[in-house]
């Protein structure tokens, strides 16, 4: 058997499916979605660094 005794404790669902965004990111104990911010704010959590920037330059 591999791993330390602490690894045996890692068998519970920390995140469940979010009601608002549908991703598996709703933290059960915190009651906050890590993906969309549901439970923390009414606004959808969005950042500019989430998507890659398109420079418009082609490689030669």
UniProtKB/Swiss-Prot annotation:
Start and end residues, zinc fingers (C4-type): 18-36
Cofactor binding comment, as recorded: Binds 1 zinc ion per subunit.
NCBIfam families noted in UniProt: PRK04179.1
Classification via Pfam families: Ribosomal_L37e (PF01907)
GO cellular component: a single term: cytosolic large ribosomal subunit
Residues reported to bind Zn(2+): 18, 21, 33, 36
Ribosomal protein found in the keyword field: yes
Protein task: Binds to the 23S rRNA.
Record-linked PANTHER family: 60S RIBOSOMAL PROTEIN L37, RIBOSOMAL PROTEIN L37
Cofactor(s) named in the record: Zn(2+)
GO MF terms held by the record: rRNA binding; structural constituent of ribosome; zinc ion binding
Stated name of the protein: Large ribosomal subunit protein eL37
Family (UniProt): Belongs to the eukaryotic ribosomal protein eL37 family.
GO biological process: translation
Keywords associated with the record: Metal-binding, Ribonucleoprotein, Ribosomal protein, RNA-binding, rRNA-binding, Zinc, Zinc-finger
Organism: Methanothermobacter thermautotrophicus (strain ATCC 29096 / DSM 1053 / JCM 10044 / NBRC 100330 / Delta H)
InterPro entries membership: Ribosomal_eL37 (IPR001569), Ribosomal_eL37/eL43 (IPR011331), Ribosomal_eL37_CS (IPR018267), Ribosomal_zn-bd (IPR011332)
């Amino acid at each position: 058997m591999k791993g330390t005794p602490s690894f045996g404790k890692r068998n519970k669902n920390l995140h469940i499916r979010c009601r608002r965004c549908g991703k598996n990111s709703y933290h059960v104990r915190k009651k906050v979605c890590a993906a969309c911010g549901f439970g923390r704010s009414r606004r959808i959590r969005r950042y500019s660094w989430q998507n890659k920037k398109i420079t418009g330059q082609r490689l030669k």
